[in-house]
Structures are given as structure tokens and as C-alpha cells.
Amino acid sequence: MKTVVFAYHDMGCLGIEALLAAGYEISAIFTHTDNPGEKAFYGSVAHLAAERGIPVYAPDNVNHPLWVERIAQLSPEVIFSFYYRHLICDEILQLAPAGAFNLHGSLLPKYRGRAPLNWVLVNGETETGVTLHRMVKRADAGAIVAQLRVAIAPDDIAITLHHKLCHAARQLLEQTLPAIKHGNILEIAQRENEATCFGRRTPDDSFLEWHKPASVLHNMVRAVADPWPGAFSYVGNQKFTVWSSRVHPHASKAQPGSVISIAPLLIACGDGALEIVTGQAGDGITMQGSQLAQTLGLVQGSRLNSQPACTARRRTRVLILGVNGFIGNHLTERLLREDHYEVYGLDIGSDAISRFLNHPHFHFVEGDISIHSEWIEYHVKKCDVVLPLVAIATPIEYTRNPLRVFELDFEENLRIIRYCVKYRKRIIFPSTSEVYGMCSDKYFDEDHSNLIVGPVNKPRWIYSVSKQLLDRVIWAYGEKEGLQFTLFRPFNWMGPRLDNLNAARIGSSRAITQLILNLVEGSPIKLIDGGKQKRCFTDIRDGIEALYRIIENAGNRCDGEIINIGNPENEASIEELGEMLLASFEKHPLRHHFPPFAGFRVVESSSYYGKGYQDVEHRKPSIRNAHRCLDWEPKIDMQETIDETLDFFLRTVDLTDKPS
């Protein structure tokens, strides 16, 4: 049976050996070039392929159409993936009549995603395993073909568990590959309600947070022990690595991170104490705990910290342009809730941020980005993170003022992007779900969905293509000039302070604000083209939490990524949104102050938006990247968002001349 194999690491080597032993004909192997910054303790797939006389390739992008065509020419009957590190596109998966199968190092549906070996140890699991499953477009989500359980002993560390998983994988493949070859397999669908997903880990993720229980810190040490990069902490600015540890149920009133004793080297934790059995100062040699204490100059009562002392005192400076807007003011609130951010903001008004104006770590200037270019350039240079949130993002303006949309949304933002390139500053840029346009995919995927818009004589697409071109410019600056960036795409965020009722009166607002105005004024709710268009509505609190995690950027996981931020479970048509809003309005305690409901009225889009408008029938996000990069998923139900948004706007209405 002819196969093409995607493989890396020890699992890749043993998978290839198992295929050959089972009589498969391997036409080609795709692998990765080794990362010079990674300690290569594992077998080389490339060397094995060369020794076996099998063609081997390591393309940067195996999903490029040229590689898809070359793989198609190989006519594989079945495809296998053994620890290949990139997602394989659906076009390749569909090339094999018998399907494609992946070996994953966990008991799916638990621990989908990256680094399951390390994550199960971090989380203190007592059992894991290996799974062979059918590959589908979504990562690690296909039907299960076979599984083998592996017990995790209390003294297991990453390398010992790795060896156990390799042994289990050999057994699993020996048992299962002949059955696949003969088409004699039983597949079991994964239970989505039991699925968990974890993102990529980097060396920077393994810092020891001493306020946590000793058992949690010990699990971290186990999860990244040699040959992984190791868990680490700091004495002042001196970094040291902990290679092995033990938990002590030591009852101490000492502050977490305090040295309780030198021999053994005991550190107070949030609960109990951690004994550092072996460790390493800086780039030195490994030594036992008490010698490490001497090397670091520790004495009883010394304090350890999770980051360098000089870093701990420095607040991250965040520049938010458009700080008074919907996202800007909510993000400011979230950042100021923490104690390590300094927020600098510019906008043409301050009504939504008035509650922050006296905050010691909030600095605001009233101004226009098209005028205050010198102020902006200075603050881009001064700050660490830049969020240019200024844009015209209301559909009626796309047809009413297309040139103004282009000038503000594209030209002004391009200037800010170039400042970030010039001063080598990190930019977090608000793309938009509008860039997907009329895409027909069930889920809009950041890395694979096509971006489809209408003809030039439909000016409603000027916002979409302006944002898309900026996305591409930012991506190119990242590739060619090292710009540190993340693009995020909000999907219909809703909540208090979304637009205002005055904007709705002139038609320049988002859907829910316009509907609320209709209820407040007793005018009919207009359903554009029947209101059957579906959207996925996202609570502003869920959206801001995801955006906050992008700013935090744990382990630099968000660098160079495009991340949809939306709630695929909160899908509703505009008509359904109106009905839910009406039901909430009718039971609101202020309802009696407002006129009777005037009903729904169907209107044509051309009469409402003007000529040149086209609508999109559905817009549902894939949030795979948000899971992977942010460990995030939305939690808030749409009805709760509607209730809170309505309540906010009703309480802004002057009721003095309303009937009681």
C-alpha cells in the first residue's frame, strides 16, 4: 500500500519503521529542518529516510500549491502523520483514497494541540496515552482508530514519559497498521464535550510562580526537566534553572519565594515548600541544591522572584489610538485592573473613558490621528505595544463615505504601522471579520479560508479590502523586516458602550444599537433584506479577555499570528437578534417609560444603505488559533450580553419627558 509520510522526532522514526515492517511502500517523507535553538535529543527522520533510500523533503510550507501538486503525483493510497509540527491542508488529506491518519501523544479528545507530553505533567495527570486517529481539517478532531493508555508515575519526568509513550506507540502501530492496510478498522467519533485543547509551549512559559502550591511547581519541574529547557526562577537578575525537585509539606509563615533553609534548599510556596534537589546557575553546570544556594549567594530569608528584578519594576507601556472607542475603553479598564501596565491614549472624545482620567497610570490626550502625527510618532517610540484602534467600522459609511473610510482606515493606519517598523515596536492590529467577505466555508479560518469580495462597483467592500491590504502589509513587514505583530479579527463584539444612540439616529452604528434606538423611539425595527443574515455575537468581556492575553503574549505565542476572536456558539440571524432584544426590552423595569413596540419592517438593503451594498449570509469563526495561542474560549451566552447591552443604553436615556 503506497503512502506518503509526514514525520519528525522519535515518534516519526518509529512510525516509519512500523510502516516498513507492516509492508507499506513509502513514496516520500516530509519532515522539518532542525531548529538550532532546540536541543535535539531525538532521532532524525531525515537520516533514517536517507539510510532507507526514501526521498525526503523539508519545505517551509508543505501546503503550497506546488507541493500539493507534487504529492498528488505520488498517488498515495493512504497518508500518515507522526509528530509533524504543521497542520496539513485539506487538499492534501483528500489525496489519499483510504484517508489520512495521525499519531497523537494523548488520550484524545483530551489534550488536543501542542506539547501534550509536557501539558499532562504540568497539570499533574496520572494517566495519558497515544491515539491514532483519522485526520480532518480541524487539528486532532478526527475519529479515533486506536488508543493505548500509559500510566504516569509520581517520579516520571518528561523524558521518562516520552520513552513510555514511544513504547506504547510501537505497540499501537504494530497492532493497527495491518488493519488499516486491509481496510478493517473500527472508528469511534470523538466526544466534543470532553475535548480540551492546549497551545504551544516555549522555554519562557516555565518560570516558577512561587505563590502557587509546591505540588504545582514540582509538576512544572517534572514537565520540562532535561533535555527540555527546564523550569527557572531568579535571584535578583540572576537566572537559575531547577532540574529536579521534591514537595515538602512544610508549614511556614514565610512569604512565597522565601528561602526556608539552605541544606536542603527549601523554598516557601503558596502551599507547602519545594526542595530544589538539583539546579544550575545561569549557563553553568548542574549541581545539588545546597551547592546551588552557595553559588547564588542565598541565605535563609532570601527572596526568589519569577522574573528579573529590574523587569519586575518596569510597567509595560501600551499606546491605544482610539482609546475612547468601544474596544479601547473596555481594554483600558482591563489593563488598569492589573498593576503592570501604563496606558497612553488618544481620541477625539473622552466620554467613555472619563472614569479613568484621574488614574495615575492612564495618560490621555484629546486629538485626531490625522493631525497629531508628531505626538503619535513620539509615543510609538516611547511605548512597548501599539494598538491602532481608530477606524470607520459601520456598514452604512462604506457606501456613504467610501473615500473617507479609505483615508482613515488605510492611509492613517499605514503611517502608524510604518512608525512601528521604524522603531521596532510590537503592533497588535485590529483586522476584521469583514476581510472574509463572501467566503463560503462553514467556519472562517485565519490560515486557510479564502477572502472573497464583490466587484469594484460595490463600494461596501472598501472597508474589507482596506483592512485586508493592511493585514498583508503587516505580514510582509513581519516576514521581511522583523516587525513583531499580531492580527486579531473581532466577530460582532457587543456590550455596553457599543456606539451610542445619537450615532444610531443618523444610521452610523452597529446592528444592536440601531435596534435599541428603534425600541426607545417606538419606530419599527428594520430588517434589511428580511434579516436572515447570520452572525456570531461575542460578549465584549470575552473579546477583551482574549485581547488582553494577546497583549500578555505568554511565551511569545501570539507573534506572527492571525487570531479570530468570536463565539461560534452564539450564532443568530439579525431577525433572531431583534426578537431576543424585544423580549428583553418587554420585561425591563424601565419598559413603561417607552412607546409601544412598532413591529418589524422588512426593507431592501439598497433603500437603507444605498446602491453599492452587498451583504454576507453567514460569518462563523474558527477559533482554533485562539485556543492554541491564548488558551481561550468564549464563555458568555448571547442572551446575557443582550440584557446587559440593553440595560446600559436604556439607562442613558433622559426619562424626564418620557411617560411614567
From Swiss-Prot:
Similarity annotation: In the N-terminal section; belongs to the Fmt family. UDP-L-Ara4N formyltransferase subfamily.
InterPro entries listed in its UniProt record: Arna-like_SDR_e (IPR045869), Bifun_polymyxin_resist_ArnA (IPR021168), Epimerase_deHydtase (IPR001509), Formyl_trans_C (IPR005793), Formyl_transf_N (IPR002376), Formyl_transf_N_sf (IPR036477), Formyl_transferase-like_C_sf (IPR011034), Lipid_A_modif_metabolic_enz (IPR050177)
NCBIfam families assigned: PRK06988.1 (NF005414), PRK08125.1 (NF005998), PRK11908.1 (NF008872)
Location of region: Formyltransferase ArnAFT: 1-304
Binding site for NAD(+): D347, D368, I369
Keywords, ordered alphabetically: Antibiotic resistance, Lipid A biosynthesis, Lipid biosynthesis, Lipid metabolism, Lipopolysaccharide biosynthesis, Multifunctional enzyme, NAD, Oxidoreductase, Transferase
Binding positions for UDP-alpha-D-glucuronate per the UniProt entry: 393, 398, 432-433, 460, 492, 526-535, 613
Pathway the protein contributes to: Nucleotide-sugar biosynthesis; UDP-4-deoxy-4-formamido-beta-L-arabinose biosynthesis; UDP-4-deoxy-4-formamido-beta-L-arabinose from UDP-alpha-D-glucuronate: step 1/3; Nucleotide-sugar biosynthesis; UDP-4-deoxy-4-formamido-beta-L-arabinose biosynthesis; UDP-4-deoxy-4-formamido-beta-L-arabinose from UDP-alpha-D-glucuronate: step 3/3; Bacterial outer membrane biogenesis; lipopolysaccharide biosynthesis
Presence of the UniProt keyword Amino-acid biosynthesis in the record: no
Chain positions recorded as (6R)-10-formyltetrahydrofolate binding sites: H86, L87, I88, R114, V136, K137, R138, A139, D140
EC number: 2.1.2.13, 1.1.1.305
Extent of the signal sequence: none
Catalytic-site annotation from UniProt: H104 (proton donor), E434 (proton acceptor), R619 (proton donor)
Protein name: Bifunctional polymyxin resistance protein ArnA
Quaternary structure note: Homohexamer, formed by a dimer of trimers.
Functional summary from the UniProt entry: Bifunctional enzyme that catalyzes the oxidative decarboxylation of UDP-glucuronic acid (UDP-GlcUA) to UDP-4-keto-arabinose (UDP-Ara4O) and the addition of a formyl group to UDP-4-amino-4-deoxy-L-arabinose (UDP-L-Ara4N) to form UDP-L-4-formamido-arabinose (UDP-L-Ara4FN). The modified arabinose is attached to lipid A and is required for resistance to polymyxin and cationic antimicrobial peptides.
Organism (species): Escherichia coli O9:H4 (strain HS)
PANTHER family referenced in this protein's UniProt entry, alphabetically: BIFUNCTIONAL POLYMYXIN RESISTANCE PROTEIN ARNA (PTHR43245), UDP-D-APIOSE_UDP-D-XYLOSE SYNTHASE 2 (PTHR43245:SF13)
Pfam family, one: Formyl_trans_C
A GO cellular component annotation in the UniProt record: membrane
Catalytically driven reaction(s): UDP-alpha-D-glucuronate + NAD(+) = UDP-beta-L-threo-pentopyranos-4-ulose + CO2 + NADH; UDP-4-amino-4-deoxy-beta-L-arabinose + (6R)-10-formyltetrahydrofolate = UDP-4-deoxy-4-formamido-beta-L-arabinose + (6S)-5,6,7,8-tetrahydrofolate + H(+)
Site (Transition state stabilizer): N102
Gene3D superfamilies assigned to the protein according to its UniProt record, in alphabetical order: 3.40.50.12230, NAD(P)-binding Rossmann-like Domain
GO molecular function terms noted in the UniProt entry: carboxy-lyase activity; UDP-4-amino-4-deoxy-L-arabinose formyltransferase activity; UDP-glucuronate dehydrogenase activity
Lineage: Bacteria, Pseudomonadati, Pseudomonadota, Gammaproteobacteria, Enterobacterales
GO biological process, one term: lipid A biosynthetic process
